[in-house]
Amino acid sequence: MAKRDYYEVLGCDRGADETVLKASFRKLAMKWHPDKNPGDPEAEIRFKEISEAYEVLKDPQKRGAYDRYGHAAFENGGGPGGAGFNADFASTFADIFDDLFGGSMGRSGARSAGGRARGADLRYNMDITLEEAFSGKTAQISIPTSISCEVCSGSGAKAGTQPKTCRTCNGAGKIRHAQGFFTLERTCPSCQGRGTVIEDPCPNCGGAGRVTRERTLQVQIPAGVEDGTRIRLGGEGEAGVRGGPPGDLYIFLSIEPHTFFQREGADLYCRAPISMVTAALGGTVEVPTIGGEKTKVKIPEGTQSGKRLRLPGAGMPVLRSRSFGDMYVQVVVETPQNLTKRQKELLAEFEGLSSTDTHPESNGFFAKMKDFFQGASSDND
């Protein structure tokens, strides 16, 4: 039977780049791998065909020869097998085999000899106030976590016994499986890659080598942390398997919304209401700071509502620095309500005394309105 075109086998056009070829090969190899299609002779044929096509097209030199001469380029002993199976090709297959059955092609796994493995990392979510983020704090937390069994010292074996070498893999932790022109390795199902089995498990941990306990830790929260800050505590995660190193603990901080301040980086923003008289004549207004003190803010004469006044260095500390952000006070001019008759009379009298100098914005606005309507009237004439 004549060989199919390699590009047709992989479902790619002749201009496909290496990324497209690799993605297509991976998809087809996953579909037709014999381990996913046991007892299916067609799957074995298709898998070999796919492997051969990719081995040629992934290599620029072989691809060039194929594009020029077709399958004839590899006749008379010049076939695509043999040395063409390089590390990159093996890496691609290894990724596929990991997806298929959690094995590998000679690659080292997370477990070392004897089944030792690093413990899992843990995550702890902590809510803090803006004041605590400003000053920093020492927090005490309790977390349920796996620790090394104190009875068997993490071995998982009953006192006076030792784990035995796994008979299935002879202590290798992996089983070799011949497939075509290469050899696969998969994790031993009997010992789960440890190379040893426990015949007499520790009664305290049931052979796991670890037990769950509640641990209390002191966590130092530095001043200036922001919402979403992550703090890593090395070695405070779950205990390792069979004496492996422990994982880490990650503290994720969430800062609660504040009733008075809003934060942007190291700067703080707040609003302060003032009277019309204070806005017109000037004065001072007292506002709180994030540190708990009160400070007086000078209101310049003629201050308009919405104006922001800056207090240098009154914001949040910058993390791992001696500098501070600023605090911005936005002035909100209150319109008086529930006025007495006399107050209304005085305001009316003031309005009568007003001029373009006292209300430049208003007068400018009405002047523009007048010009607008006059211009519109002229256009209609």
From Swiss-Prot:
Where do the annotations place Zn(2+) 1 binding? C149, C152, C202, C205
> Mind listing the GO molecular function terms for this protein?
ATP binding; heat shock protein binding; unfolded protein binding; zinc ion binding
Pfam families on file: DnaJ (PF00226), DnaJ_C (PF01556), DnaJ_CXXCXGXG (PF00684)
Q: Which residues form the J domain?
A: 5-70
Zn-finger (CR-type) residues: 136-214
Q: Which cofactor does it need?
A: Zn(2+)
Q: Where are the CXXCXGXG motif repeats?
A: 149-156, 166-173, 188-195, 202-209
Stored InterPro entries: DnaJ, DnaJ_C, DnaJ_domain, DnaJ_domain_CS, HSP40/DnaJ_pept-bd, HSP_DnaJ_Cys-rich_dom, HSP_DnaJ_Cys-rich_dom_sf, J_dom_sf
Give the cofactor note: Binds 2 Zn(2+) ions per monomer.
| Top-level taxonomic group | Bacteria
What are the alphabetically sorted keywords of the record? Chaperone, Cytoplasm, DNA replication, Metal-binding, Repeat, Stress response, Zinc, Zinc-finger
What is annotated about its quaternary structure and interactions? Homodimer.
Functional note: Participates actively in the response to hyperosmotic and heat shock by preventing the aggregation of stress-denatured proteins and by disaggregating proteins, also in an autonomous, DnaK-independent fashion. Unfolded proteins bind initially to DnaJ; upon interaction with the DnaJ-bound protein, DnaK hydrolyzes its bound ATP, resulting in the formation of a stable complex. GrpE releases ADP from DnaK; ATP binding to DnaK triggers the release of the substrate protein, thus completing the reaction cycle.
Q: Which family does it belong to?
A: Belongs to the DnaJ family.
Domain-related comment: The J domain is necessary and sufficient to stimulate DnaK ATPase activity. Zinc center 1 plays an important role in the autonomous, DnaK-independent chaperone activity of DnaJ. Zinc center 2 is essential for interaction with DnaK and for DnaJ activity.
Q: What is this protein called?
A: Chaperone protein DnaJ
Native source species: Azorhizobium caulinodans (strain ATCC 43989 / DSM 5975 / JCM 20966 / LMG 6465 / NBRC 14845 / NCIMB 13405 / ORS 571)
Source organism lineage?
Bacteria, Pseudomonadati, Pseudomonadota, Alphaproteobacteria, Hyphomicrobiales
